[in-house]
Amino acid sequence: ADASSVQIRVDPNNEWIEIEDDGIGMSVEDLNGKYLRVGYRRRDEDAEHGCKTARGRPVMGRKGLGKLSLFSIADVIEVQSAKNGGKHGFRMTAPDIKKAVQDKRRYHPESLADDALTVTQGTKLVLHEIKRQRLGKGVAALRKRLARRFSVIGQANGFEIKIDGRPISATDRGDLPKVQFLWTFEGYEPEASTIAHVVERESLPAR
């Protein structure tokens, strides 16, 4: 998405989750040909950028399957995106997808009405009918998982993730205070405050 900021809002009653970025957004063609297409191989099929985004970031993901993981925590997914002055959106539901598979027919998401589109820049996902048992221990656990998953979070990388207005940082990982010996790849610089206690540190050549 080439976003510099991702905002995550979690309903206190776990009725919905919103994820909104300020990236480049998607056109109707992008939504149909890339987002909705399972198995889209960006590295091979994006002739303009390939393995790098427009901002020069390494592309994440492999098989175009990550989008399906949303259905592990919610049965209804709304996708809204804005690009080049146009806004578009649709709704997908797990029961309708299963029914289409059973009937051996192609599934078509439900288009969102123009007055239902609230996105102004980038892409917005809204999850409904949350599977509460999959949320684990709530927001605290989500912060830890995201901090451990994305090493690019932080001002040094020009990328932030906020949950309910509070930025995620390396301290949310929860594991660095236990580290005595640290090896990092060249180009990655942990926040100084998180590694002040490290006994020995070494930088390895970039992969």
Predicted region positions:
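Surface loops and adjacent helix of pleckstrin homology
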Residues: 82, 130, 172-174
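Short linear motifs in intrinsically disordered
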Residues: 7-8, 68-71, 143-154, 199-205
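GHKL/Bergerat-fold ATPase module in large chromosome/replication-associated machines
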Residues: 159-207
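Short glycine-/acidic-enriched loop or helix-start segments at secondary-structure transitions
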Residues: 89, 136, 172-173
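ATP-binding catalytic core of ATPases
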Residues: 101-169
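GHKL (Bergerat-fold) ATPase N-terminal catalytic module, capturing the glycine-rich phosphate-binding loop
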Residues: 1-124
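Short, well-ordered alpha-helical segments in soluble proteins
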Residues: 34, 42, 149-150, 159, ...
